[in-house]
Every structure is written in C-alpha cells, then in structure tokens.
C-alpha cells in the first residue's frame, strides 16, 4: 500500500514519495509533507525557472536559488513566477 501524507501544497491527503528527493533536511521535510503530485508540479515549475532564467546547474548560485525557490514553493508564499509564461 502507498505511503500517504497530508500534502502542505495541495492541502489534502495524497500519496507520498517513495524516498526523500534531497539528501538534506529540506529533502526530509519535503518527504514528510509533500505528495508525489505536488512534487511533479514543482519539477515542471523548476524546469521553467531554469529555462526562462537560463540557469546553469553547474553554478552554485543557481542551485542555491532553486533550493530557496523550492522551499518557498512548498512552505512559503510560493516560488517566483516564470516571466513570459501564460497558463493555458
């Protein structure tokens, strides 16, 4: 049976992830409080942030920015909006 969590992003009980997405405290916090569905939505948003801002994951500042955005997306007021993106 799937592991269930109360997802802080979706504000409902949903299927949790199979393992922590990051090997740190933020990863543990996400594992305990974020559903697979919300994580998938974050990865799509993260991809748009990387592409629109032309981020290089080899750059430590870009990785730090994405970590901050991830924390804001799940536990804060939301991540930065992607410039030029118009939802359909």
Curated annotation (Swiss-Prot):
- Keyword Iron annotated: yes
Stored PANTHER family? FE(2+)-TRAFFICKING PROTEIN-RELATED (PTHR36965:SF1)
The UniProt entry's sequence similarity note says: Belongs to the Fe(2+)-trafficking protein family.
| Keywords associated with the record | Iron
Single GO cellular component annotation? cytosol
Function statement: Could be a mediator in iron transactions between iron acquisition and iron-requiring processes, such as synthesis and/or repair of Fe-S clusters in biosynthetic enzymes.
Could you tell me what this protein is called? Answer: Probable Fe(2+)-trafficking protein
GO MF annotation, one? iron ion binding
Q: Which domain of life is it from?
A: Bacteria
One GO-annotated biological process of the protein: cellular response to oxidative stress
Q: Does the keyword Hydrolase apply?
A: no
